[in-house]
C-alpha cells in the first residue's frame, strides 16, 4: 500500500472514531438530561407547579412532552393565568419589544395570498434579537395585513380584503381562525374598487384586542354605503362589532358614538378603556372612550387644548405604562410634545419633548432608510417604550424601523427594523392559548 493510501486510511479511521465518540457523548448527555428532568416527578405537585411557574414558555413546551401529568398542569387555564401574572412582573425588569411583519412578501402585480408572518423579539435595553418565530396562516391576507396591539402575549392579525381574522400566540405557535366580521361579509358582496379600498374604507382597518373578564375584539368603524346591515340595531354614523370567543361569533352593539372616528389613527387601550380620535367637527377633535367591562361609549371630558384644535394628521395616540398618551408635532418648531392622561381623566401632564430635527441622524437614516429628522414632516413619531436610561424608543407610521431618542443629548440611534414590520410593540411571552 502506498504512503498516500495509508495516510488516507488512517485519517478515515480517525474521523470515524471521532464520530463514534461524538455519538456516545450525545447519547450519554441525553440520558443524563432525561434523569435530571425526571427527578422533579418525585416532588409534590404543588412544589413542582411553583417551580414550573418560573420557567420560560419555550422550556414549558418541552416539558409537556415528557409527562402526561406535566402536560395537564401546564395546559390548565389556572396555570396559564398564574404564569401570565409572573411574566408581567418579570417584564418590568426585563422589557422586550416585538416586531411583526410579513416574510418573503410577494412582489409583482398579481394578487396572491401572502401567508407567512414573522415575529422578532428583541431586548429593549440591548437591542439584541432574542427569538424569531415564523408562522403560516393558510387563508392569507392578500397583502393587506393589519395587526393589533399585544394582549397578554396574543395578537389579532386580519385583512379587510379577505375574510381572514386570526388570533395567534407566537410563543406557543398556537393560532385560531375566527369567522369574518359582519362588514367583511358585506364588503365582499359589493367588490369595491381599489380607490374605494384606499379612500372610503380606511376606518375598518384597525381593531382593538382587549380583556375584561374574558378576551374580546372591538371593531369600531364609520358607516358606509357598502356595509349597511339590516340586522344591525344601529343606523348612526358608526358601527361596532364585538367578537365573543365563547360563542365564536360577532355581535353588534346597539349604542355607538355619534362622531365619525379618524380613520388613520390606531386605537389605544389603557386603564380598562379603548380610545379613538374623532374626525374634526366644528374644528375640534374629540376622543371616544369605550369601557371594556360595561361595553359603553363616552367622550373624554377634557382634552389637551393643543390636541383638540389640531389637524388629526399632526397628532398621535399611544399607550405608555398603561396610561393613555397623546402627542403633537408643532409645525413651526417641529418639536414634538407628549402628554399623559391621569387615571382621573381630568388632567394632562407633559412628560416628554422630542426634537428630532436637531438630531444628527445620517447613520440612522442609512440603516433605516428613513429620514427621522426631516424638517417638513408634520406626522409625529410614536413612543413605544421608555428605557431604564430614560431613552425613548420611537416608531413612525412611515418607517419600518425603531430608533432610540436620547432627550439629554438630543440624538438618535438605530434600534432595529425589518422591511415589512407592520407592528412594533412592547411584548412579553405567555402560555395563553385555546381561547
UniProtKB/Swiss-Prot annotation:
Basic residues composition bias: residue spans: 16-29
Chain positions of Kelch repeats: 164-217, 224-270, 273-317, 322-368
InterPro entries membership: F-box-assoc_dom_typ1 (IPR006527), F-box-assoc_interact_dom (IPR017451), F-box-like_dom_sf (IPR036047), F-box_dom (IPR001810), Gal_Oxase/kelch_b-propeller (IPR011043), Kelch-typ_b-propeller (IPR015915), SCF_F-box_component (IPR050796)
Domain F-box: residue ranges: 37-82
SUPFAM superfamilies in alphabetical order: F-box domain, Galactose oxidase, central domain
Pfam families per record: F-box (PF00646), FBA_1 (PF07734)
Region (Disordered): 1-29
SMART domains membership: FBOX (SM00256)
PANTHER family: BNACNNG10540D PROTEIN, F-BOX PROTEIN CPR30-LIKE
Record-linked NCBIfam families: F_box_assoc_1 (TIGR01640)
Protein name: Putative F-box/kelch-repeat protein At1g13200
Amino acid at each position: 500500500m502506498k504512503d498516500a493510501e495509508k495516510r488516507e486510511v488512517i485519517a478515515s479511521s480517525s474521523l470515524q472514531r471521532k464520530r463514534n465518540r461524538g455519538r456516545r457523548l450525545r447519547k450519554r448527555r441525553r440520558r443524563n438530561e432525561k434523569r435530571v428532568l425526571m427527578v422533579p416527578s418525585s416532588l409534590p405537585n404543588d412544589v413542582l407547579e411553583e417551580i414550573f411557574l418560573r420557567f420560560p414558555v419555550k422550556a414549558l413546551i418541552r416539558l409537556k412532552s415528557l409527562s402526561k401529568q406535566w402536560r395537564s398542569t401546564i395546559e390548565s387555564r389556572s396555570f396559564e393565568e398564574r404564569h401570565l401574572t409572573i411574566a408581567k412582573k418579570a417584564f418590568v425588569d426585563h422589557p422586550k419589544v416585538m416586531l411583526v411583519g410579513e416574510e418573503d412578501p410577494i412582489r409583482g402585480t398579481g394578487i396572491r395570498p401572502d401567508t407567512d408572518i414573522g415575529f422578532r423579539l428583541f431586548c429593549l435595553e440591548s437591542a439584541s434579537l432574542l427569538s424569531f418565530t415564523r408562522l403560516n396562516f393558510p387563508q392569507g391576507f392578500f397583502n393587506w395585513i393589519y395587526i393589533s396591539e399585544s394582549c397578554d402575549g396574543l395578537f389579532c392579525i386580519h385583512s379587510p380584503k379577505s375574510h381572514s381574522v386570526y388570533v395567534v400566540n407566537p410563543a406557543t405557535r398556537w393560532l385560531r381562525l375566527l369567522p369574518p366580521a359582519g362588514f367583511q361579509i358585506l364588503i365582499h358582496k359589493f367588490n369595491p374598487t381599489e380607490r374605494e379600498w384606499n379612500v372610503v374604507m380606511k376606518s375598518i382597518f384597525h381593531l382593538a384586542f382587549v380583556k375584561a373578564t374574558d378576551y374580546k375584539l372591538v371593531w369600531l368603524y364609520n358607516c358606509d354605503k357598502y356595509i349597511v346591515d339590516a340586522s344591525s340595531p344601529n343606523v348612526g354614523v358608526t358601527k361596532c362589532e364585538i367578537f365573543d370567543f365563547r360563542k365564536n361569533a360577532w355581535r353588534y352593539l346597539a349604542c355607538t358614538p355619534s362622531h365619525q372616528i379618524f380613520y388613520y389613527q390606531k386605537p389605544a387601550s389603557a386603564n380598562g378603556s379603548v380610545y379613538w380620535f374623532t374626525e374634526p367637527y366644528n374644528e375640534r377633535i374629540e376622543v371616544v372612550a369605550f369601557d371594556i367591562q360595561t361595553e359603553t361609549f363616552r367622550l373624554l371630558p377634557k382634552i389637551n387644548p393643543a390636541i383638540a384644535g389640531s389637524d388629526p394628521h399632526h397628532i398621535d395616540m399611544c399607550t405608555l405604562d398603561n396610561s393613555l398618551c397623546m402627542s403633537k408635532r408643532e409645525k413651526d418648531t417641529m418639536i414634538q410634545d407628549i402628554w399623559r392622561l391621569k387615571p382621573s381623566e381630568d388632567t394632562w401632564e407633559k412628560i416628554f419633548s422630542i426634537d428630532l430635527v436637531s438630531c444628527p441622524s445620517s447613520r440612522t437614516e442609512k440603516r433605516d432608510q428613513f429620514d427621522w429628522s426631516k424638517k417638513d414632516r408634520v406626522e409625529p413619531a410614536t413612543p413605544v417604550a421608555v428605557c431604564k436610561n430614560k431613552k425613548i424608543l420611537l416608531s413612525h407610521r412611515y418607517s419600518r424601523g425603531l430608533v432610540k431618542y436620547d432627550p439629554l443629548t438630543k440624538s438618535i440611534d438605530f434600534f432595529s427594523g425589518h422591511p415589512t414590520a407592520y407592528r412594533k410593540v412592547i411584548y412579553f411571552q405567555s402560555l395563553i392559548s385555546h381561547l
